[in-house]
């Protein structure tokens, strides 16, 4: 698996939510174990015009990472229980990020099962909190990049537009009308939960 170049991430946040679908997120642990998952669900968050985005009101120490180079990891703790994995987008100094909502496990399955304390395959990474637990992603990963060797996204065939679903984002109370959740339709690893807006294909 070869890492995607920096140029891949140099696009709008909305475009990146679709481009990332089907690509492989990889983490190489210090002991050499490789963990990999196919990205099957994403959500866009923008600093401008999006009240659900952490950077909507202002730049703060907490959201500072969102203003960095596209391809930087923005990891935060939420609900007192889960870490969320985001990939920074947009040009530097303009906040934006793609939340990785779900993956399909590809490599390192046994490690993931131990991390998640479950052997149920479809349940290993079928949600943003589940996938970070499976990948052992925590606060120390915040600010890392996809270009330093430990983390990267590998290329894979693009998902045809008629196989991409779109809907409102899950688990938010503001800007719910924005159709910025993208997912591979029919994939068993896409997360559940209450959806804001209508689910449809992009065709």
From Swiss-Prot:
Its EC number is 3.2.2.-. It is an enzyme of class 3 (hydrolase). Signal peptide: none annotated. GO terms for molecular function: alkylbase DNA N-glycosylase activity; DNA binding. The keyword DNA repair applies. One of its GO terms (biological process) is base-excision repair. It holds the Pfam family Pur_DNA_glyco. Keywords: DNA damage, DNA repair, Hydrolase. Disulfide bonds: none annotated. NCBIfam families: 3mg, PRK00802.1-3. PANTHER family: DNA-3-METHYLADENINE GLYCOSYLASE. Belongs to the DNA glycosylase MPG family. This is Putative 3-methyladenine DNA glycosylase.
């Amino acid at each position: 698996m070869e890492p995607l170049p920096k140029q891949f991430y140099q696009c709008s946040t909305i475009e990146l939510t679709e481009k990332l679908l089907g690509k492989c997120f990889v983490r190489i642990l210090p002991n050499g174990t490789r963990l990999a998952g196919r990205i099957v669900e994403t959500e866009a968050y923008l600093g401008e015009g999006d009240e659900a985005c952490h950077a909507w009101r202002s730049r703060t120490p907490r959201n500072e990472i969102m203003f960095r180079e596209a391809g930087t990891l923005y990891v935060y703790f939420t609900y007192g229980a889960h870490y969320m994995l985001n990939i920074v987008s947009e040009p530097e100094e303009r906040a934006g990020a793609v939340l990785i909502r779900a993956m399909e496990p590809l490599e390192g399955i046994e490690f993931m099962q131990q991390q998640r304390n479950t052997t149920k395959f479809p349940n290993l990474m079928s949600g943003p909190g589940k996938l970070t637990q499976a990948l052992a992603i925590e606060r120390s990963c915040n600010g890392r990049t996809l270009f330093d060797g430990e983390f990267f996204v590998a290329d894979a065939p693009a998902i045809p537009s008629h196989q991409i679903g779109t809907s409102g984002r899950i688990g938010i109370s503001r800007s719910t009308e924005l159709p910025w959740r993208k997912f591979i339709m029919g994939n068993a690893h896409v997360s559940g939960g209450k959806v804001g807006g209508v689910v449809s294909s992009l065709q």
